[in-house]
Amino acid sequence: MTKALFFVAGIAVGLCTSLFAAQGAGSIAVLNTSGVYIELVTLVPGEGSGQHSTIPGEVGIVAEGEVVLSSPAGRESLQAGKAYWLPGLTPHDIRNESNRLAKVYVIAMKRCD
């Protein structure tokens, strides 16, 4: 089973970096500006992000299929058209437990002071 690792970081001193390293179905950066990073993440059945957190808050919108979001608040099943919000540094895992392909738009606001 492959896993994807999500990492979005803001670096103090006014520089911002965003990085998504994926093994498996993959991802595509849809928008990467100085203020926001949007990525379309594709998860094959059984694939997940692995437990991770992002420095800024994270918004996810399920575009296709179904995923399970696990966080300290519990487990939540999200179907296409549903969204989630996680405050910065919240540990979480996004997993495709279905037998269909799942696609999620992941949005992180960059903070460069």
Model-derived features: positions:
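Short acidic-glycine-tyrosine-enriched beta hairpin
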Residues: 43-44, 72-89
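Histidine-centered metal-chelating micro-motifs
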Residues: 48-50, 84, 89-95
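Glycine- and acidic-residue-biased ligand/ion/polar-headgroup-sensing regions
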Residues: 55-72
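A short glycine-rich, His/Asp/Glu-containing loop-to-beta-strand
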Residues: 23-50, 107-110
